[in-house]
């Protein structure tokens, strides 16, 4: 019985081996995250002659090379939630923090919870790729939102009032194309109304936008009443051009990532089942599968709900028992975000005779707020998802 505590950092780890009773077998030493370093560590653990369990704290992506190397060589690995490890280490009165001491504390954790250590398994390559792409999708979405905010701020300063006119009309890039074409209120006014109307209609027809004389008149009237803040100068034009370029580049990158996610998700057996669920489209289906991963790794539907962080743990002390509890939020925040978008889709489309939408409406009828009702609906949705997908896999014994 040998607990191996590994304190992971970027590019290297500190390793400590400990037996019951606090007997240190391997004094804390450093291992580099290289093939040579991992090979030496594996050889050391295999030569111990003991039942070895390696324990690591979850550290984002830093621990992944160590976990991969140990699992490929058949060594038991358990990656522990960082909050659990922090609370275990905080039992000490003295506040001492070094890599060597952390490795010893992790080894002690392995001994204290030897029977409760859960083995870590590497997910299938498809799920790993999907999760990687999903993270990049969210990053690109965040950048896209910022790019749109920046562009809108610039647009308000050179072409005030144009956003309100363009937002209600067809054309995903109509506003940015319009700003790139006409650049500034002064430029529109210098053209004159007759010339601008002809030019706008010709441009709209070429771009495939609605060719509307009335729209051209509204734009010219707005330009006459608008007060631009930035001058019609070369510096302003550079800022506008670059803002639009960034906006289109980030949007194209996000679309490319989503396309690849859809292609990968379609190779999974459960994709068609998830896609057939009400209000789950081509965008939400791959994102949902990416965040949940292989549903068979959860021992029950409650485990999936806890993984999403929407569970509400009970709170009771003496005669007091809390009735209204907040969700824990100790789980995958990306899954919560995606799940909330799924619930928004349910509320928008209102599928008839659907148990999840009926449940949301029931909660609203009980006086619950819209957000609370949707979180309750997400809880039910994940239970349904777990039941359908696990039952689907049970019907495919060859895959199992």
PLM regions and their residue ranges:
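A detector of single, family-specific signature residues
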Residues: 1-400
């Amino acid at each position: 019985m040998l607990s191996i505590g590994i304190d992971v950092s970027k590019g290297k780890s500190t390793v400590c081996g400990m037996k019951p009773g606090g007997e240190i077998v391997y004094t804390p030493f450093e291992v580099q995250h290289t093939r040579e370093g991992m090979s030496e560590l594996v050889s050391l653990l295999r030569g111990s002659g003991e039942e070895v369990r390696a324990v690591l704290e979850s550290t984002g992506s830093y621990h992944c090379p160590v976990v991969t190397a140990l699992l490929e060589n058949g060594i038991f690995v358990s990656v522990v939630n960082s909050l659990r490890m922090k609370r275990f280490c905080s039992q000490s009165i003295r506040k001492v923090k070094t890599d060597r001491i952390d490795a010893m504390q992790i080894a002690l954790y392995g001994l204290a919870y030897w029977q409760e250590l859960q083995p870590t398994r590497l997910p299938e390559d498809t799920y790993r790729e999907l999760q990687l792409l999903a993270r990049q999708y969210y990053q690109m979405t965040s950048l896209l939102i910022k790019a749109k905010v920046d562009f809108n701020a610039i647009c308000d300063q050179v072409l005030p009032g144009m956003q309100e006119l363009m937002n209600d009309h067809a054309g995903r890039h109509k506003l940015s194309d319009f700003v790139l074409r006409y650049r500034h209120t002064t430029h529109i006014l210098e053209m004159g109304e007759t010339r601008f109307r002809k030019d706008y209609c010709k441009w709209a027809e070429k771009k495939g936008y609605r060719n509307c004389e009335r729209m051209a008149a509204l734009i010219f009237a707005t330009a006459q009443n608008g007060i631009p803040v930035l001058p019609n100068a070369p510096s302003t034009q550079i800022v506008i051009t670059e803002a639009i370029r960034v906006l289109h580049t980030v949007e194209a990158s996000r679309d490319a990532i989503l396309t690849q996610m859809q292609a990968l998700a379609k190779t999974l057996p459960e994709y068609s089942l998830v896609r057939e669920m009400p209000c789950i489209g081509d965008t939400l289906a791959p994102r949902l599968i990416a965040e949940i991963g292989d549903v068979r790794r959860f021992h029950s539907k409650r485990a999936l709900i806890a993984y999403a962080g929407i569970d509400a743990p009970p709170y009771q002390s003496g005669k007091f028992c809390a009735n209204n509890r907040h969700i824990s939020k100790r789980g995958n925040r990306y899954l919560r975000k995606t799940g909330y978008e799924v619930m928004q889709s349910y509320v928008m489309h209102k599928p008839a005779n659907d148990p999840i939408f009926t449940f949301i409406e029931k909660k609203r009828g009980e006086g619950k707020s819209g957000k609370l009702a949707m979180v309750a609906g997400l809880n039910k949705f994940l239970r349904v998802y777990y039941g359908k997908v696990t039952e689907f896999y049970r019907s495919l014994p060859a895959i199992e």
